[in-house]
Amino acid sequence: MKKQIYTLFFLIFFFSCNDTAETFLSLKKNKVNVRYGPSFDSDVKYVYKKINLPIKQIDKKENFRRIIDMKNNSGWIHLSQLKNNNSVISTDLKILYKKPSSFAKPIAQLKKGRLLIVKECKKKWCSVETGKFTGWVDKENLWGISK
């Protein structure tokens, strides 16, 4: 009996831990409709007009994903308009460095709200591209990536 109780607690703990992982996605197109509900019959709530914009998935129903953006706008988007996340948004003034170190040569200053395309990430740093600049930025104050 004790063994069954311990097994039950373990399974509950294991599955509850897996549900806490954040899922970020990016917009696949330049124009994406966000709907009130998970159906093409639902009215359009608003339209995103920014390809690669990162969004956070908070629910799913069939081929629709309920999302929330950096400004807490939420709604439903069809899966065909989404892709695996490849971008982040700077939530504060940031410095883009040549190498993944705050002692490296600064390349550019990134303003709050800047969309960055992620090339790769290491522990505390991500290699990003924005406009004509490519470099490294620390993960702190970036929205759209699991820490």
Can you name each region flagged by the protein language model?
Residues 4-14:
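Sec-dependent N-terminal signal peptides
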